[in-house]
Amino acid sequence: MSQITNEVKNQIKKRRTFAIISHPDAGKTTLTEKFLLYGGAINQAGSVKGKATAKHAVSDWMEIEKERGISVTSSVLQFNYDGYCINILDTPGHQDFSEDTYRTLMAADSAVMVIDASKGVEAQTRKLFKVCTMRHIPIFTFINKMDREAMDTFELLDDIENELGIATCPINWPIGSGKEFKGVYDRASKKVEIFSDTKKGTTQGEVKKVDINDPEIFWLITDDQKLQLEEEIELQDGAGAEFDQELVSKGELSPVFFGSALTNFGVETFLQHFLQMTTSPLPRISDRGPIDPMEEGDFSAFVFKIQANMNKAHRDRIAFMRICSGEFEAGMDVYHMQGGKKVRLSQPQQMMASERKMISKAYGGDIIGVFDPGIFSIGDTLTTAQDKFTYEGIPTFAPEHFARVRQVDTMKRKQFIKGINQIAQEGAIQIFQEYNTGMEEIIVGVVGVLQFDVLKYRLENEYNVEIRLENLPYEYIRWIENEEIDLDKLTGTSDMKKVKDLKGHPLLLFVNEWSIRMTIDRNDGLKLTEFGRS
């Protein structure tokens, strides 16, 4: 292990790398854009810097995202704010694309959980929260849409604690909701923040702060609102959890903030507090033990995402890497652990969704994209360390929907195979071939059915291949853990299907849980698992 320099250590201390998670339509992408607005990365929410119109969300770059108004892939966004270098991983909220979100959370050091004030904790929030708790990363809560009718504040806090099993500590407190929403009260400074009109939230607005005991407060909120605020704060101070930075760092206490991302209420306040409370890059688990970025001087990174055709003109493939330790320099040679050889990382880029910027240096905590000629896979480790190591793999989640896929034009077989393989390598779909049939028959597995639509759209628009999908009755897939199992001799129910994945690993498809149990009973020692590993 080489010694880390003070310069590199100081650069890493500035990094804040976090993911934003939520149920669909809770306002996650809007909050992301407001962070970019306050960080100066965009002039106006909804538009890339220099563009004139607010037509699409900055983080929604794929054509299908713009057409449907949903996020279907994680976006990587970097900007500077108040001395910090911020890497935001904006994740798709739609449940059909949750696997991309799971992988993205592996690259984050903390998470911002966005909750709709009128709905509280929703199904997708629960799923994503579980992944965060598995990694023991800090979780910060932004309760959004306070400018609309909202649940009672105490009910919202109870909902988070009861549904997710995490203690909460409100850092600020809302004054009213819906049409009566006036702003937020900061519990530490005892000041009320009143927000002015900000052109429907597209530009930064002035933040007016007034002490709760200042006579001017009566011009801004009603007597009843002030009385209700004082009563609620007294109750919260007496019965609520106190702020504890250590518990926050362990992911056991979630600081809570209230606001409205659409109108900018509470956004910059949240960003300022969050950057102070959250963590700089954390140690990562490897087969050599934890790799601490504050001690490890060698460069190391892992691939958490692969994206083809981000620029249709270039027809390229970008591997997104989370730098875990050390300093990255353009053109450096690193050892690719899974490939078993050295590779040169040339033309490194940092992203603003699909916009690219060539870089010469990056540090632990940063997310970079490098050109991938087809050698990288999700979960791969790269390092310059002499004492080589491999970071823990990224789980592959079991698909729940399956279809046989064929190209309409048999003359386009080559484009079809290339396209479906590239999309599978991104992790957007999983492809399987029936045992002993080769690539003639391809079965696609997805976590959510909307991914079939995305597959069809992308093959047609990016590879000029039209496909037909034949839905299959299978609902369960299991990886075979025993390497010694002979697939030819394995017996199961009549509706079980034997398949192999891209790496040649044997798997079994089942129509129901009874079929799984029967197959295990008929094959002594057979071990099946729901999760593969990259």
Where do the PLM segments sit?
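Structural and coupling elements of P-loop NTPases
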Residues: M1-S534
